[in-house]
Structure formats: structure tokens, C-alpha cells
Amino acid sequence: MMFRDQVGMLSGWFKGWNECEQTVALLSLLKRVSRTQARFLQICLEHSLVDCTELHILEGEANNPAIINQWQQESKDKVISQLLTHLPLLKPGNIDAKMAYMKLLPKILAHSIEHNQHIEESRQLLSYALIHPATSLDDRSALAMWLNHLEDRTSGNFSTQSRCRSDSLDYGQMQYYHQRQNSDDKQNGWPNSRDSGICISSSGWQEKNTGCENGHLPLYSSSSVPSTINAIGTSTILSGQTHHSSLKRSVSLTPPMNVPNQPLGHGWMSHEDLRARGSQGIPSDHAPLSPQSSVASSGSGGSEHLEEQSTACNTFQDEGSGMKDVPAWLKSLRLHKYAALFSHITYDEMMSLNECHLEAQNVTKGARHKIVISIQKLKERHNLLKTLERDVLEGGNLRVPLQELHQIILTPIKACFPQNSNTEEHDQEADSQPPLLASKNQATESKDSASGGIQQHHIGNCESESGGVPLPESDLPGQFTRVMGKVCTQLLVSRPDEENISSYLQLIDKCLTHDAFTETQKKRLLSWKQQVQKLFRSFPRKSLLDVAGYRQQRKTSVDVLIGSRGFGQSNSLPTAGSVGSGIARRNPRQFQIPSRNLPSTRLSLLGASSLLGATQRASASNPAMLKQGRQNLWFANPGGSNSMPSRSHSSVQRTRSLPVHTSPQTMLMFQQQDFQVPVTEPDINNRLESLCLSMTEHALGDGVDRTSTI
């Protein structure tokens, strides 16, 4: 696809967004430009707004605290309209006006959520507030709680529009997370947000030597930008390979059949400039993937025959046919010139194609062989998903399974509607199961939730798709959802990995807009997305940087001192700290995690009913493996589930094991005072072995427990 085609397609999508979504998308693209480009854009914007007197009047009102305070006497409908118009014009550094906005916003959000009104407008207000350079880190922290309330409100009234529109907050959320963590990504050559000298003011972009009030808006690149923004910013513009499944962010964003022939920016970019890149016309919905418009369609035989078939019935347009993603899949295989050949056949007919059928259609020998091999790989996806499910359960690196899932979701997937309802009934039963340990630890868990922790039932919900009922090979969406549930559990209990979390959220966004997944599956996926997002929000400031530093030092580390709860490691059960002792790190810096003061009985309950996975129980129930289990059943490497086992010189050897339920507070509180525990290594080994035996005995006595989430 030529540059002009890409610009035209992007312009078509841009017109389908509301003003807030357009602003978020542009801001995401602008963070990728250099300083010179940013300065040029600033000049263009300032020049175009010189004679805009109405804007200057609105800007004066937006920065007048007296006028903002008067809005409190107006009706809620009018106040929301005024906020959407004036909040983007707030100048950084105007503390009085900002405080007036911060007093008014919670009242409006509370009214909208309570009466279930103006939900979309509330999302837009939160998006503006979270990415605005005038709001400080504390202001964003105060507003972050409203994200959960909005998500809970939309999840109760689940619909395609509300699900897709909820993504309009993703960029603001991720921007907020990065500012909390002070990430120093320098992929663009810009030092960081505080050194770039770029901030937003009333007249556009201004270059300053000092930052805005809160260090202004960071414009560095990030892997956690929502999938839609990444797809538009990288896949479409840079690589030229489009995957329509990843670009359908909402119903209104589907590109029109005929995109207007005009460049992006109107007067800023002439037609001659665009034509210099090379262009052959404006594409339709799937134009770049068809032999008629593709610049790569010439070369081998059979093209005339394919053109004749292009007017036949197009199965690419049929909902639930499984053929909508075939053009993008063929393009990824460099076989898009044969898209017309697949446009008049069904999904089942495509899966049964062989070289004889293709030869009859005048397909060249090399292309025939490549198509047959690719179809065979499609048939192996179900087994691959089952393998990925086992790999995720065993722990280890989540990056490879996530990459495989990204590849699978881009392939053609047909919706599966089983004739009997056994699977659906099982899924409903799994959803209706009581939360894990809720009756035993409800008070404690609610306290953890109030402080930002993860409740145990979140992990149970992630496994609602992972029942023992085998799925048919044709049910790829069901098997895919099952693996996504396993990955959700690993993310919730493992050490935080920003790249994995971002990749997982992008996967869910693609699934939510995919017509092969049922509404029940999409509800689960949306629930898991909200759980992972809540986990991401609960990370303390600089936590990811601390974890990165901790991983670099893991070869010289033995363990982190653990309080009575004993969940300092993401991939191990309570160690010596759980029995009243700790292990001194060989690193000069020592850390201490304060005790959560849980009763000793709860530790036994956790060890018996939830901390043992199916793999561990199988090992523990085998007498031949019991001795081995005493040595390596519990202790995983300190790098977490997403790092390779550490070859530490410590006397405590760690192997990979299933992670346990934990909370981000106990996982990530590494900024504590120094602490030394005088204890000998033989004493440590004895206590650890005793703890292993105790946990194994509890596990063997709990073999029929069905509340485990693994």
C-alpha cells in the first residue's frame, strides 16, 4: 500500500472518531516525532489559529476560576458540555483554575455514574484530565479511582458500543501509569518528558527550558499504548501491512468503502507531496488485498481468471463466516493476489483445499504449495493452543505464548456454536462458583481491596473458562479464551511485566472486536481486562524500575525478607519468613516487607486450598516423586514467571513452579529500610524442608478440593 493510500485510510478512520478520540490518537502519534517535527507542527498550528478570536474568548473563560465556579449552579447537562469545551484549554501553571476543575469533576462523575447518564461524556472528561499537562500526579491519582467506577458501570450493561468506547480511556490510563513510574524510554532520541521541553499551552506547542507544573506530557514511545493506537501508528503507516482485525477499535472506526481523496492536514501537505511517494488511487475496504488494486498483483499466471471471479459472492463480508480476516492473512503470507479465489468459498471449503483444487484454479505451483502448508498450519492451531495452555500452567516465560496468541488471532477464525449446551452450562457453573476463600477471608480480602490489593476471587474468575470439559477442535474461540484465562492468572500472581501486560490487553481488545467470539466469552475477556488494568493501576511509583533492578541482581540474591503473610515472591510459596525467620540477601542492600498480621491459620488454609496447582498436586501425590517434591516443589526463581531460572550460588536452589496468589503491595514494596537477620544456612535449609513437608501434607489431604483455579 502506497503512502497516499495509507493517509487516505487514516483520514477515513479519523473522521469516524469523536473529538476526544481524535485528540488521543493525534497525541499518541505526536509522541513519536522528533523535536524538529514537533516545532514545525507548533508553527503550523499557531499560524492556523492566529485569527481565531472565538478560541481566545473560550481560552480566557477556561482559565478564569470565577467562571468555572459559577458552573456549579448550572444543570449537569450544561456543566458537562462546558467542561468538554473548556477543560482542554486550561493553561499549565494556572493552579487556581485547575483546582476549580478538580473540585467540579468528581461531582459530575459521581452524578453520571449514580444516574447512569452521560457515561460517554464522563469517559471523555477523564481522558482529557489524565493526559492534560496541567494536572499533576496527585490530581491523576485522585481521578484514577473513577476509572474503576466507570468500568464497573459499563460491564454491568455490556454491549458492543460500550465495550468499544471504553477503550477511549486506554491512552489516558497508560499515560497516567507511565508518569507514575517515571519511565525513561528514549527510543525517539528525546531524553524524557522533563528534558524534552515540550508542553501544551493555549497557543499550541511551546518549547521551554523547564517543564510544566508536573513535568508536562511525556512524548516518549511506549509499548503499553493501546493496540488501536499502535496499529494505526506503526502497522498502517510504517510497515504498510494492515490487519483489519486489529484496527477495528469501535463500530464507528470501521473505514468507509470509499475514502475521500484528500491528504492529512489539508493545507499542510500538498497533493504533489503525497504523489511523490507513489500512488495509484484511494483504496476501498479491502482494496490493497485484492488483485485489482494491489501493486504486487502482477507477475505470475492466473490473475485474469481471478479477476473474473472477483464479481462472485464475497464471503469476506459475511458475519461469522470466519472469512473476514482471510485477506489480511493472505497478505501476511504474500499471497494477497489470490484473495479473489477465496472470496466465493466458505471457511470449511477453504480448510479442505488441496493442490488439485488449486491447480484447477490456475494457481502456480509455488503458491499452491505455500497455500496448502498454510492451511495445514491453520488446522494445527487447536493443538497449539492446548500446548500453550500447558506451557502457561507450568510457569516460565509468558512472552512466547503471548506472541503465539497474537499470531493466531490474526488468522481466520470461525465462530463455533455447539448444538448442545453442555459447555455453556459448565461455563456458567464456573462463573457462579463462590470466590476462592471468600467465606474464610472475606474481611481480610475486603481490606486488601480497599488498599489496592488483588482479591482472591479475581484469580478464580480468570479460570472460569478452564474447566475439565474438552472442547472440539472446531471451537478455536473457546480454546483461545481458555488460554487467555490461564495467562490472566499468571499475570495477576507473577512479578509485574509491563510489556506482557500491554501485550495481553492488546490481545483482549482484538478479541472483543472479533465476531468469532461469543458474548459470554467477550464478557469474560472484558472482566479479565479490567482485573489486569486494576493490577496495573495499583503498581507503586517506580515499581517497575525497581523490579528491573531486582532482576539484574537476582544472581547474587537469595530471597526477600517476608512478613507473616509470606507472599514476597511471585513464583514461590511462603519461605522462611512464614515461620518467623528470614533470609539475609547477599546483596549489600537489604529489604524488608512489613507484616500484614494475618492469623497463622490462614496460612494453612491458603497452602491447602489455593496455593497448590494441579501440576504440583500430581507431583506430590506420587510417592516416587515425593522426595523430589521436597526439594523443588515450591521454590521458583526470584526473577518471576517471566524470567529464566536463576543459576544462583545460593544453597537454596529454585526451580520453576506455579505462582501463588499475592497482592501487588507485598510483591512490589522494595523501598524499605535495611535489615539484617543473623541466621545460619543449615538452619534455613531445615526450616524450608519442614515447611515443604507441611505444605505437601496439606495438599495430599486436599486432593478432592475443586476450588483451585488452576
Curated annotation (Swiss-Prot):
Major location (coarse): cytoplasm
Family statement drawn from the similarity comment of this UniProt entry: Belongs to the SMAUG family.
Highest taxon in the source lineage: Eukaryota
GO molecular function: mRNA binding; translation repressor activity
SUPFAM superfamilies: SAM/Pointed domain
Annotated ranges, domain SAM: 319-379
Keyword Signal: no
Residue ranges that the Swiss-Prot or TrEMBL entry lists as coiled coil: none
CDD domains, A to Z: SAM_Smaug
Region (Disordered): 276-319, 441-476
One of the GO biological process terms: nuclear-transcribed mRNA poly(A) tail shortening
Subcellular compartments: Cytoplasm; Cell projection, Dendrite; Synapse, Synaptosome
SMART domains: SAM
Keyword presence, Cytoplasm: yes
Organism of this sequence: Xenopus laevis
Entry GO terms, CC: dendrite; P-body; synapse
Pfam family, one: SAM_1
Record's protein name: Protein Smaug homolog 1
This protein's UniProt keywords: Cell projection, Cytoplasm, Repressor, Synapse, Synaptosome, Translation regulation
Biological role: Acts as a translational repressor.
Compositional bias of kind Polar residues: 309-318
